[in-house]
Amino acid sequence: MLDFLPFSRPAMGAEELAAVKTVLDSGWITTGPKNQELEAAFCRLTGNQYAVAVSSATAGMHIALMALGIGEGDEVITPSMTWVSTLNMIVLLGANPVMVDVDRDTLMVTPEHIEAAITPQTKAIIPVHYAGAPADLDAIYALGERYGIPVIEDAAHATGTSYKGRHIGARGTAIFSFHAIKNITCAEGGIVVTDNPQFADKLRSLKFHGLGVDAWDRQSGGRAPQAEVLAPGYKYNLPDLNAAIALAQLQKLDALNARRAAIAAQYHQAMADLPFQPLSLPSWEHIHAWHLFIIRVDEARCGITRDALMASLKTKGIGTGLHFRAAHTQKYYRERFPTLTLPDTEWNSERICSLPLFPDMTESDFDRVITALHQIAGQ
């Protein structure tokens, strides 16, 4: 019997093992020099002046919203087609999430939906670069500038993604994820990039107890002594063990993403003979990171529901994912916003399915998936 094929698997090798050993041998395993190396390397990738490594992208979103002063009564616009952590952070700060619809075919938040949701209480806009493709940043930043509203890019899916020749994040502030299924991973982790030095300083303080110094001081070889708390903060710093793995992964990013793109191209070719509908690509110039390959399973077209397809693939030893069940349909948000309807988000939320896609996926793995899809479709 064939081994179970997961929908994602991290691409780890000798380089990551060596990186971990180096940190263990150094005697300094928590936040230290590897964090600074990672931040500098990520700035070279995105073109930003500052990067702040954190324990997760969720942590990064939390302190980014705090650094903007988001609080009681404020509104933050974001799509419902996202992971709920963004909504949770908004709510936990006492603010109100304003969830908007997305384009039916790309699942990207549109500037039209954003602008329609802007009120005098709007204090931030959070577009999501979905599945590895970029949102329409020119139009979204134009809205931010017109109304004086900061934009924070949710780039959890977008390490390696470019929009009109520039890496995601280069326009301002963006938050990336190093979670286990992401394009590069260190098990858990994230990074915030920005060109605003005051904003970066706030992030560094908030991620480490609100202290007026970073978690690591290059000159003293540790944390500066007698540091004072400037404001209450959190314990969101990234250990060097994780940072070292992320660095090793970052050095492989081009190769990892090239393999993802090759598999995605094979999927697109194979879908021509199947009833399942992949997402459309954005019309603007971009480089897709192919974090996810998503199909829509419409029962009227496919003869099967999404949930039944996922269950059938599981019986054949093939894993899938759901990215995402729309946030406003989750119990807490459904009860808090009982009248909210987002037609294109809801249509997709009931039909989307993420197929296996990861750099170490073999040709035989790919053939298994396509053969199974043909069998399920009755072909």
UniProtKB/Swiss-Prot annotation:
Functional description taken from the UniProt entry: Catalyzes the conversion of UDP-4-keto-arabinose (UDP-Ara4O) to UDP-4-amino-4-deoxy-L-arabinose (UDP-L-Ara4N). The modified arabinose is attached to lipid A and is required for resistance to polymyxin and cationic antimicrobial peptides.
Gene name as annotated: arnB
Catalytic reactions on record: UDP-4-amino-4-deoxy-beta-L-arabinose + 2-oxoglutarate = UDP-beta-L-threo-pentopyranos-4-ulose + L-glutamate
Pfam family, one: DegT_DnrJ_EryC1
Enzyme Commission identifier(s): 2.6.1.87
Subunit structure: Homodimer.
Protein name: UDP-4-amino-4-deoxy-L-arabinose--oxoglutarate aminotransferase
Modified residues (N6-(pyridoxal phosphate)lysine): K182
Biological process (GO), any one: response to antibiotic
A GO term from the CC aspect: membrane
